[in-house]
Every structure is written in structure tokens, then in C-alpha cells.
């Protein structure tokens, strides 16, 4: 169900981009292997209980976290209550998690203890928003920065 809803929400990201990536990966065995592994991973989806699905949809629609109206165990969850350092990675071309949805969160944090990294994409990742986890460029460029930040932020 989640795959179908994702496709309906963004055919560019969940259909056309993955076919483009498959084509571009065809001549590179390592890229094609990663592409196929990500595709296989997408097939591991379990049915989400309907009550959980309704809650998730409400969270997205109402944007309660950003509005400061999300309550968890009697506590308000909001950017203004985040006290830990934050590292965010954005893909400038993503319509799944666009920078315009991440940057307002960072700007709403109570202090400037955050860093924003940019992921410029890869071939062989099937789904662009998964690239920061599976892509070769992400492993070569981003992850050393992320791990260094984690060591420093402690």
C-alpha cells in the first residue's frame, strides 16, 4: 500500500527516476547490483495496520511537529524543544524530502547547533531519497563527514 501511495504522490521519484537509474546503471555492474538490492528492499514492505496508517497521514497533513502541537507521552514535541545537535542531509532535487521541508525545521531550532549537508545524487540507487544510505558518492563523500560530525558532536 505504501508503495502505491508513494507512486501516486510522486510518479517522477517512484517510477520515472528509478527506471532512468536502472538504464544508467546497466553498464556498471556495481551500480546495477546496488540498484537491484534497493529494488528488492522495496518489495519487503509489510502491510501497515490501518490505525497506524491513519495516524501517519494525520501527522503529515497536520504538520503537528513543526506547528508545536504534537504531544507524545504528555510532552510537546516541537523543533523548539530539540536540545541535541542536529545533522540534516538534503538532496536539492528531491521532491520526496525537499530542502524546503528541512530548512524551516533547522531554522526553528532553539540554537544554531546544526549542520546541513547536500547530497548530489548517485547512479545505482533506484530511489533517489535512498541514495544517501546506499550510494557510492554518499559513502565516499557524505559518510566521512557525517561520522566526523558524530565524533565531534558528542
Predicted regions and their residues:
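Active-site nucleophile elbow and catalytic-triad environment of alpha/beta-hydrolase enzymes
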Residues: 56-78
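Short alpha-helix in the alpha/beta-hydrolase fold that links the catalytic acid
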Residues: 84, 98-108
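Hydrophobic alpha-helical scaffolding
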Residues: 43-47, 92-95, 136
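C-terminal catalytic-base region of ester-bond hydrolases, centering on the histidine
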Residues: 55, 67, 92-93, 106-107, ...
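Alpha/beta-hydrolase-fold enzymes
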Residues: 1-51
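Terminal low-complexity/disordered tails
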Residues: 93, 98-102, 143, 147-148
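Short beta-strand/loop motif that positions the catalytic acidic residue
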Residues: 82, 88-90, 94
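Catalytic active-site module of serine/aspartate enzymes centered on a nucleophile-bearing elbow/loop
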Residues: 112-154
Amino acid at each position: 500500500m505504501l508503495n502505491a501511495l508513494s507512486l501516486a504522490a510522486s510518479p517522477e521519484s517512484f517510477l520515472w527516476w528509478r527506471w532512468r537509474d536502472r538504464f544508467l546503471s546497466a553498464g556498471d555492474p556495481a551500480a546495477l547490483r546496488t540498484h537491484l538490492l534497493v529494488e528488492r528492499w522495496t518489495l519487503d514492505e509489510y502491510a501497515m495496520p490501518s490505525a497506524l496508517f491513519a495516524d501517519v497521514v494525520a501527522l503529515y497533513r497536520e504538520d503537528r511537529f513543526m506547528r508545536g502541537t504534537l504531544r507524545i507521552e504528555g510532552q510537546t514535541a516541537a523543533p523548539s524543544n530539540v536540545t541535541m545537535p542536529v545533522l540534516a542531509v538534503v538532496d536539492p532535487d528531491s521532491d520526496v524530502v525537499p530542502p524546503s521541508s528541512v530548512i524551516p525545521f533547522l531554522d526553528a531550532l532553539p540554537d544554531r547547533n546544526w549542520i546541513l549537508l547536500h547530497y548530489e545524487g548517485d547512479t545505482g540507487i533506484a530511489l533517489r531519497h535512498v541514495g544517501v544510505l546506499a550510494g557510492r558518492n554518499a559513502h565516499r563523500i557524505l559518510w566521512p563527514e557525517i561520522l566526523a560530525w558524530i565524533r565531534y558532536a558528542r
